């Protein structure tokens, strides 16, 4: 089940609130310009599926997002517990960073923890199959796929170069709960 846990930066062990209803999660995130929605991911996709297979399965949804928001690049990140670089990728995504463009993810299988650092608060969004999240450009965040990842997510970009992170150098991500905590 998707959820949103909201923490004050001074209290990483105790969330101020935990939300599990789509409408509550979406409205809380919308206050900060973050879009959260649930789309039907009817075509079964498993970690390890090729990028082409995933994109072809969701071509209609992808085209809708690209047209509506002007995205120019799409790719797929698909990881499972057998991936040879899972530890390196997890470590990289767990560093707080931001992007010069919106970060859009549509989870078509599995789950991941998208954590946003906005002012004095941290918003931990557990995204699962069918969840669509769009994080505005410049928002500090990190992503945890867990020690044993299982997810497939479609990523959309305004930048033809795809995923380009600007790391903040702050260690805040290490103080907050991880996906499997």
Swiss-Prot record:
Fe(2+) binds at residues 97, 99, 103, 141. The keyword DNA repair does not apply. Ni(2+) binds at residues 97, 99, 103, 141. The record marks 105 as: Important to generate the dianion. Its cofactor is Fe(2+); Ni(2+). Binds 1 Fe(2+) cation per monomer. Binds 1 nickel ion per monomer. One of its GO terms (molecular function) is nickel cation binding. Pathway: Amino-acid biosynthesis; L-methionine biosynthesis via salvage pathway; L-methionine from S-methyl-5-thio-alpha-D-ribose 1-phosphate: step 5/6. Its EC number is 1.13.11.54, 1.13.11.53. It catalyses: 1,2-dihydroxy-5-(methylsulfanyl)pent-1-en-3-one + O2 = 3-(methylsulfanyl)propanoate + CO + formate + 2 H(+); 1,2-dihydroxy-5-(methylsulfanyl)pent-1-en-3-one + O2 = 4-methylsulfanyl-2-oxobutanoate + formate + 2 H(+). One of its GO terms (biological process) is L-methionine salvage from S-adenosylmethionine. Pfam families: ARD. InterPro entries: ARD, ARD_bac, RmlC-like_jellyroll, RmlC_Cupin_sf. The record marks 102 as: May play a role in transmitting local conformational changes. Keywords: Amino-acid biosynthesis, Dioxygenase, Iron, Metal-binding, Methionine biosynthesis, Nickel, Oxidoreductase. The record marks 96 as: May play a role in metal incorporation in vivo. Monomer. Belongs to the acireductone dioxygenase (ARD) family. PANTHER family: ACIREDUCTONE DIOXYGENASE (PTHR23418:SF0). Catalyzes 2 different reactions between oxygen and the acireductone 1,2-dihydroxy-3-keto-5-methylthiopentene (DHK-MTPene) depending upon the metal bound in the active site. Fe-containing acireductone dioxygenase (Fe-ARD) produces formate and 2-keto-4-methylthiobutyrate (KMTB), the alpha-ketoacid precursor of methionine in the methionine recycle pathway. Ni-containing acireductone dioxygenase (Ni-ARD) produces methylthiopropionate, carbon monoxide and formate, and does not lie on the methionine recycle pathway. HAMAP family: Salvage_MtnD (MF_01682). This is Acireductone dioxygenase. It comes from Pseudomonas syringae pv. tomato (strain ATCC BAA-871 / DC3000).
């Amino acid at each position: 089940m998707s959820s949103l846990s909201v923490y004050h930066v001074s209290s990483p062990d105790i969330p101020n609130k935990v939300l599990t209803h789509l409408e509550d999660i979406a409205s809380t995130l919308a206050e900060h310009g973050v879009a959260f929605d649930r789309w039907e991911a009817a075509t079964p996709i498993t970690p390890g599926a090729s990028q082409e297979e995933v994109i072809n399965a969701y071509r209609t949804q992808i085209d809708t997002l690209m047209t509506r928001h002007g995205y120019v690049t799409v790719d797929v990140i698909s990881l499972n517990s057998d991936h040879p670089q899972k530890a390196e990728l997890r470590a990289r995504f767990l560093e707080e960073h931001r992007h010069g463009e919106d970060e859009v993810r549509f989870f078509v299988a599995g789950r991941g923890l998208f954590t946003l650092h906005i002012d004095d608060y941290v918003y931990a969004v557990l995204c699962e199959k069918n969840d669509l999240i769009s994080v505005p450009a410049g928002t500090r965040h990190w992503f945890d796929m867990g020690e044993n990842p299982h997810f497939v997510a479609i990523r959309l970009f305004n930048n033809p170069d795809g995923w380009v992170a600007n790391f903040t150098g702050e260690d805040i991500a290490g103080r907050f709960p991880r996906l499997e905590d």
